[in-house]
């Protein structure tokens, strides 16, 4: 797997700050320009004094004292009048607003060129085991299949014995054969139940 990252041009930022001049800050990315142009007037004591002295005391109202600091209030109102925040400025037009000399101008221009190459080899081994015990459902567990027991037996397999019978009362009667067959069948059922438990 190979990953290649090439950053040839990052946004170029230029900024110029001038006293009593327009200040422009622009950035470009993928050919698109985003700009904002604002004009700020720094507080000037002389201009503030002229402004206040040109007005009569009767004309000075609450609008002239919007701030506790009259000098700041004057700067805020002047800034609000001369601000144009909706103007789009491109990189080309921002250079035209700069003066010919760099006196009183703080300028910052930078660009970054980087080439990054990353290569990596991925080796993977996956083994899947599909051996698992098949779980029986609850219905299958509750329903046990017992082997079928045949009740019919040949008379030759059973020896009729009169030892446990009353003397002279049951000698080779027809029920004795059925009794031994039933006893053998019950014995098999009992053994099967014991094995299941």
From Swiss-Prot:
Signal peptide: none annotated. Residues 17-36, 131-166 are annotated as: Disordered. InterPro entries: Rotavirus_A/C_NSP5. The modification Phosphoserine is found at residues 67, 153, 155, 163, 165. Keywords: Glycoprotein, Host cytoplasm, Magnesium, Metal-binding, Nucleotide-binding, Phosphoprotein, RNA-binding. Pfam families: Rota_NS26 (PF01525). Its main location: host cell. One of its GO terms (molecular function) is ATP hydrolysis activity. O-glycosylated. Residues 152-165 have a biased composition (Acidic residues). Mg(2+) binds at residue 92. It is found in: Host cytoplasm. One of its GO terms (biological process) is viral genome replication. It comes from the Viruses. One of its GO terms (cellular component) is host cell cytoplasm. Its cofactor is Mg(2+). Residues 17-33 have a biased composition (Low complexity). Belongs to the rotavirus NSP5 family. Homodimer. Interacts with VP1. Interacts with VP2. Interacts with NSP2; this interaction leads to up-regulation of NSP5 hyperphosphorylation and formation of virus factories. Interacts with NSP6. Participates in the selective exclusion of host proteins from stress granules (SG) and P bodies (PB). Also participates in the sequestration of these remodeled organelles in viral factories. HAMAP family: ROTA_NSP5. Plays an essential role in the viral genome replication. Participates, together with NSP2, in the formation of viral factories (viroplasms), which are large inclusions in the host cytoplasm where replication intermediates are assembled and viral RNA replication takes place. Orchestrates the recruitment of viroplasmic proteins such as capsid proteins to these factories. Participates in the selective exclusion of host proteins from stress granules (SG) and P bodies (PB). Also participates in the sequestration of these remodeled organelles in viral factories. This is Non-structural protein 5. It comes from Rotavirus A (isolate RVA/Human/United States/WI61/1983/G9P1A[8]). The lineage of its organism: Viruses, Riboviria, Orthornavirae, Duplornaviricota, Resentoviricetes.
């Amino acid at each position: 797997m190979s990953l290649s990252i090439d950053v040839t041009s990052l946004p170029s930022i230029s900024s110029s700050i001038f006293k009593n001049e327009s200040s422009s800050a622009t950035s470009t990315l993928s050919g698109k320009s985003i700009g904002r142009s604002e004009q700020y007037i720094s507080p000037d004591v002389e201009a503030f004094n002229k402004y206040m002295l040109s007005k009569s005391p009767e004309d000075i109202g609450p609008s002239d004292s919007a701030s506790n600091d009259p000098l700041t209030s004057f700067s805020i109102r002047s800034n609000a009048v001369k601000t144009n925040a909706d103007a789009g400025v491109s990189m080309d037009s921002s250079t035209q607003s700069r003066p010919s000399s760099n006196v009183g101008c703080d300028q910052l221009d930078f660009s970054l060129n980087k080439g990054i190459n990353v290569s990596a080899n991925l080796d993977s081994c996956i083994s899947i085991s599909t051996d698992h015990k098949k779980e029986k459902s609850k219905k299958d567990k509750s329903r046990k299949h017992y082997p079928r027991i045949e009740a019919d037996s040949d008379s030759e397999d059973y020896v009729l014995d009169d030892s446990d019978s009353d003397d002279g009362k049951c000698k080779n009667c027809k029920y004795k054969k059925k009794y031994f067959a039933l006893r053998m069948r019950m014995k098999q059922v009992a053994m099967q139940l014991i094995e299941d438990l």
